[in-house]
Protein backbone atom coordinates (compact mmCIF):
# COMPACT_ATOMS: atom_id res chain seq x y z
CA UNK A 1 0.00 0.00 0.00
CA UNK A 2 1.47 3.31 -1.06
CA UNK A 3 1.36 6.24 1.33
CA UNK A 4 0.29 9.60 0.01
CA UNK A 5 2.49 12.57 0.77
CA UNK A 6 0.45 15.66 1.45
CA UNK A 7 1.35 19.17 0.39
CA UNK A 8 1.58 20.01 4.09
CA UNK A 9 4.28 17.35 4.57
CA UNK A 10 6.23 18.69 1.60
CA UNK A 11 5.85 22.25 2.87
CA UNK A 12 7.09 21.30 6.34
CA UNK A 13 10.07 19.44 4.87
CA UNK A 14 10.85 22.40 2.60
CA UNK A 15 10.75 24.80 5.57
CA UNK A 16 13.10 22.60 7.60
CA UNK A 17 15.53 22.30 4.69
CA UNK A 18 15.40 26.03 3.97
CA UNK A 19 16.09 26.91 7.60
CA UNK A 20 19.10 24.60 7.68
CA UNK A 21 20.48 26.14 4.50
CA UNK A 22 19.92 29.68 5.78
CA UNK A 23 21.69 28.79 9.03
CA UNK A 24 24.91 28.37 7.08
CA UNK A 25 25.35 32.13 6.97
CA UNK A 26 24.40 32.52 10.66
CA UNK A 27 27.04 30.06 11.82
CA UNK A 28 29.74 32.10 10.16
CA UNK A 29 32.78 31.24 8.06
CA UNK A 30 34.47 29.09 10.72
CA UNK A 31 31.61 26.60 10.79
CA UNK A 32 31.52 26.55 6.98
CA UNK A 33 35.25 25.86 6.79
CA UNK A 34 34.91 22.98 9.26
CA UNK A 35 32.08 21.55 7.16
CA UNK A 36 34.34 21.48 4.11
CA UNK A 37 37.41 19.97 5.81
CA UNK A 38 36.58 16.72 3.99
CA UNK A 39 34.86 16.98 0.61
CA UNK A 40 32.36 14.58 -0.87
CA UNK A 41 33.01 13.42 -4.41
CA UNK A 42 30.32 15.79 -5.71
CA UNK A 43 31.77 18.75 -3.80
CA UNK A 44 35.24 17.99 -5.15
CA UNK A 45 34.13 17.82 -8.78
CA UNK A 46 31.92 20.91 -8.58
CA UNK A 47 34.84 22.97 -7.29
CA UNK A 48 37.24 21.36 -9.77
CA UNK A 49 34.94 22.22 -12.67
CA UNK A 50 34.71 25.85 -11.52
CA UNK A 51 38.41 26.35 -12.19
CA UNK A 52 36.97 27.98 -15.29
CA UNK A 53 33.92 30.23 -15.12
CA UNK A 54 30.62 28.46 -15.65
CA UNK A 55 26.93 28.36 -14.84
CA UNK A 56 25.14 25.45 -13.18
CA UNK A 57 24.46 23.63 -16.45
CA UNK A 58 28.13 24.01 -17.43
CA UNK A 59 29.18 22.45 -14.13
CA UNK A 60 26.81 19.48 -14.47
CA UNK A 61 28.05 18.87 -18.02
CA UNK A 62 31.73 19.19 -17.07
CA UNK A 63 31.39 16.82 -14.11
CA UNK A 64 29.65 14.25 -16.31
CA UNK A 65 32.28 14.54 -19.06
CA UNK A 66 35.26 14.56 -16.69
CA UNK A 67 34.10 11.47 -14.79
CA UNK A 68 32.65 9.61 -17.75
CA UNK A 69 29.26 9.64 -16.04
CA UNK A 70 30.61 8.00 -12.87
CA UNK A 71 29.69 11.05 -10.76
CA UNK A 72 26.28 12.64 -11.25
CA UNK A 73 25.31 15.99 -9.76
CA UNK A 74 21.62 16.82 -9.81
CA UNK A 75 20.37 20.40 -9.91
CA UNK A 76 19.12 20.38 -6.31
CA UNK A 77 22.46 19.20 -4.96
CA UNK A 78 24.39 21.52 -7.26
CA UNK A 79 22.58 24.73 -6.38
CA UNK A 80 22.55 23.91 -2.67
CA UNK A 81 26.33 23.39 -2.74
CA UNK A 82 26.91 26.49 -4.87
CA UNK A 83 25.13 28.59 -2.22
CA UNK A 84 27.23 27.02 0.52
CA UNK A 85 30.47 27.53 -1.43
CA UNK A 86 29.51 31.17 -2.06
CA UNK A 87 28.80 31.75 1.63
CA UNK A 88 32.14 30.18 2.59
CA UNK A 89 34.09 32.21 0.01
CA UNK A 90 35.25 29.23 -2.06
CA UNK A 91 33.57 30.50 -5.23
CA UNK A 92 32.46 33.90 -6.44
CA UNK A 93 29.55 34.87 -8.66
CA UNK A 94 31.03 36.35 -11.83
CA UNK A 95 27.95 37.13 -13.91
CA UNK A 96 24.18 37.21 -13.69
CA UNK A 97 22.01 37.26 -16.79
CA UNK A 98 18.39 36.91 -15.74
CA UNK A 99 18.19 33.73 -13.68
CA UNK A 100 21.42 32.37 -15.11
CA UNK A 101 24.40 32.94 -12.85
CA UNK A 102 28.03 32.11 -13.49
CA UNK A 103 30.62 31.21 -10.88
CA UNK A 104 34.36 30.73 -10.57
CA UNK A 105 36.72 29.26 -8.01
CA UNK A 106 38.50 31.69 -5.67
CA UNK A 107 42.07 31.37 -4.35
CA UNK A 108 40.56 30.03 -1.13
CA UNK A 109 38.64 27.44 -3.15
CA UNK A 110 41.85 26.36 -4.91
CA UNK A 111 43.50 25.91 -1.51
CA UNK A 112 40.54 23.80 -0.35
CA UNK A 113 40.90 21.57 -3.44
CA UNK A 114 44.66 21.23 -2.93
CA UNK A 115 44.14 20.24 0.71
CA UNK A 116 41.63 17.60 -0.39
CA UNK A 117 44.06 16.21 -2.98
CA UNK A 118 46.78 15.96 -0.32
CA UNK A 119 44.34 14.20 2.05
CA UNK A 120 43.40 11.68 -0.65
CA UNK A 121 47.06 11.08 -1.55
CA UNK A 122 47.80 10.34 2.13
CA UNK A 123 45.03 7.74 2.09
CA UNK A 124 46.53 6.10 -1.00
CA UNK A 125 49.98 6.02 0.68
CA UNK A 126 48.45 4.37 3.75
CA UNK A 127 46.75 1.78 1.55
CA UNK A 128 50.00 1.07 -0.29
CA UNK A 129 51.87 0.59 3.01
CA UNK A 130 49.49 -2.19 3.97
CA UNK A 131 48.63 -3.87 0.67
CA UNK A 132 51.65 -3.30 -1.55
CA UNK A 133 54.18 -5.13 0.64
Segments predicted by a language model, with ranges:
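N-terminal helix-turn-helix DNA-binding core of bacterial DNA-binding proteins
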Residues: 33-77
Amino acid sequence: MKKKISLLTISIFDNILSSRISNIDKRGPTMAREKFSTLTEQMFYILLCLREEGCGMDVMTRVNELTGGRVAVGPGTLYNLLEQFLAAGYIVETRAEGRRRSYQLTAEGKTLLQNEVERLQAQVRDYEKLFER
